[in-house]
Structure formats: structure tokens, C-alpha cells
């Protein structure tokens, strides 16, 4: 039994190293990677935060004219990468995690650790993603179950809540 070393381009550690190499603010510790989730070859979602509130942590990762992130996307053969600013407010973090879709509202059920994200009808498929990939990765990133609903399906109910 010779020991074997497995090296994989599919693990999240690979993406982390690419960002460490490409982004000086990550190397220096000014920008911190909170969590990375991915479906290798398709999409990565990465939550970042900054130790300095005046520093744009997402902008640092993207780089001038998208240069830094484009180098990483190129290295990953065109895999999509969503860099999301981490947030301690869970409904805000879930809304951000559904990027590139924009949630209008996120309802939280603490007991079940379940969230319902309301999105504009024309953004429903973007929020869910191809074969559910976007919402699945958002759920892994936030550690919450996420249900995505179109605004038209809940507009009556949501309206009642706001008015009542």
C-alpha cells in the first residue's frame, strides 16, 4: 500500500487558493473568505467580508474592470463565480446569496431554519437557476433551506401582511 495523494481542481480549496493568489487583500487578510460552495464546472458562490468597513470586499475580489475575477474564471474554464458580501442579518444574506437574482423580500422561519424568498416573476428562473442550481448553492452558502416564490403567487398575502 503506497500512500496516494489526491489532487482535485473540483474542491473549494482550489478556488480559495486562486483568490488568494489573485487578490492581494485576501492574501493580506483585509478581505476574509467566510465560505465557498460550488458545483465544479458550473458555478461557485463565495461569501466574503472585510476587516475594514471602508474597503469594498466584493470589489477587491472582482478587481478593476473585472480583471481579477476574469483571471480566475478563465482558470476554471468559464465557471460562473458569484462573490457575495457576507452579512450577519440572515434575511439580507439570503437575498444576496441568490445573486444574480434580486429578492424583493425574504421571510424567515427561525424554528425550521427555512426562508422564503420573494422574487419578481420575470426573475424566478434566474433565482432558481438551471436545474435548481442557484437556489441550491445559496442554501449551502447560508446553511438555510430556501424556497423561492414569484411575487404574483404571494402578492395578495404579502399585501395583507403589510397593510394589516
Protein language model annotation of sequence segments:
Residues 1-164:
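RNA-contacting regions in translation and RNA-metabolism proteins
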Amino acid at each position: 500500500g503506497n500512500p496516494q495523494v489526491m489532487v482535485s481542481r473540483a474542491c473549494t480549496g482550489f478556488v480559495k487558493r486562486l483568490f488568494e493568489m489573485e487578490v492581494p487583500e485576501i492574501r493580506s487578510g483585509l478581505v476574509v473568505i467566510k465560505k465557498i460552495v460550488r458545483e465544479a464546472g458550473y458555478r461557485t458562490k463565495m461569501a466574503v467580508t472585510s476587516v475594514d468597513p471602508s474597503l469594498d470586499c466584493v470589489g477587491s475580489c472582482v478587481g478593476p474592470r473585472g480583471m481579477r475575477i476574469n483571471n480566475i474564471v478563465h482558470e476554471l474554464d468559464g465557471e460562473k463565480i458569484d462573490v457575495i458580501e457576507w452579512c450577519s442579518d440572515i434575511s439580507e444574506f439570503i437575498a444576496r446569496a441568490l445573486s444574480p437574482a434580486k429578492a424583493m423580500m425574504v421571510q424567515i422561519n427561525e424554528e425550521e431554519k427555512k426562508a422564503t424568498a420573494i422574487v419578481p416573476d420575470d426573475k424566478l428562473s434566474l433565482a432558481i437557476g438551471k436545474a435548481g442550481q442557484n437556489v441550491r448553492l445559496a442554501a449551502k452558502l447560508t446553511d438555510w433551506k430556501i424556497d423561492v416564490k414569484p411575487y404574483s403567487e404571494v402578492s395578495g398575502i404579502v399585501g395583507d401582511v403589510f397593510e394589516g
